[in-house]
């Protein structure tokens, strides 16, 4: 997502006004009513911590969990998914390198998934603090992770695709422009070619590409930097060498939701 923001700012816009990361999927898992496709620890941290929004005139601020719902139409046959504010690092990183007015991150969790997370929080099962149960001292969140299925072993039961992308609004050649830059992982493909379910594979492939660019010297820098600091073109080219390609979708005017 950070790389897409960098590419859009450098190649698709004269002015960037707003960057909105939008991730969603149409994944289903046979035999489970609730089975996160990622670590429940990470899921709870991202979804139950207050989401962060960045605005140039206001800086960073938090909002309510699952706030500002909007329906986003994802490409590659995924279709419409309701997305809500979720805490994620792009909101903190992108404004450091991309001149814009607003940055958000929204994820397509689905109403049922949100209800599960709210129930865990209500029951205290999201807590990291250990409690005494008989002679054992345990963290409720560790118990939750132990009873839920291992996401890495769900691939053979999963169907569908997951999409990670960046929706950018701004000005190009004197006219308003909105584009969605995205990467789609099909679970059938990732299981067949890599032996990994789509969500985990999509999460892992980008750091692998970045490390290769650093190792080869195509990316060079001193200090601590996010992906949006670097030239996006070598990254996107190498991503294609891993038999996985990105897309760019022109969005119609007026499709950007009001804050």
Language model regions located:
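C-terminal catalytic/substrate-binding lobe primarily of soluble NAD(P)-dependent oxidoreductases
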Residues: 11-259
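Active-site-proximal alpha-helical scaffold in enzymes
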Residues: 1-12
């Amino acid at each position: 997502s950070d790389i897409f923001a960098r590419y859009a700012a450098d190649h698709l816009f004269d002015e960037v006004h707003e960057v909105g990361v939008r991730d969603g999927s149409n994944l289903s898992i046979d035999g489970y009513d609730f089975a996160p496709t990622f670590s429940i620890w990470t899921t709870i941290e991202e979804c139950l911590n207050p989401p962060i929004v960045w605005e140039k005139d206001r800086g960073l601020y938090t909002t309510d969990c699952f706030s500002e719902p909007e329906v986003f139409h994802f490409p590659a046959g995924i279709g419409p998914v309701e997305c809500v504010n979720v805490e994620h690092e792009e909101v903190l990183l992108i404004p450091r390198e991309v001149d814009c007015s607003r940055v958000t991150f929204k994820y397509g969790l689905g109403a049922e998934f949100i209800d599960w997370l709210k129930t865990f929080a209500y029951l205290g099962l999201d807590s990291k603090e250990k409690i005494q149960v008989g002679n054992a001292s345990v963290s409720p969140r560790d118990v939750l992770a132990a009873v839920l299925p291992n996401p890495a072993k769900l691939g053979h039961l999963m169907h569908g695709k997951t999409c990670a992308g960046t929706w950018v609004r701004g000005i190009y050649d004197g006219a308003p422009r909105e584009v969605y830059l995205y990467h789609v992982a099909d679970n059938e493909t990732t299981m067949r070619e890599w032996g990994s379910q789509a969500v985990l594979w999509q999460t892992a492939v980008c750091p692998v590409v970045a490390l290769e660019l650093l190792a080869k010297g195509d990316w060079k820098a001193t200090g601590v930097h996010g992906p949006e600091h670097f030239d996006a073109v070598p990254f996107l080219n190498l991503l294609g060498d891993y038999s996985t390609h990105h897309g760019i979708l022109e969005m119609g005017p007026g499709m950007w939701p009001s804050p």
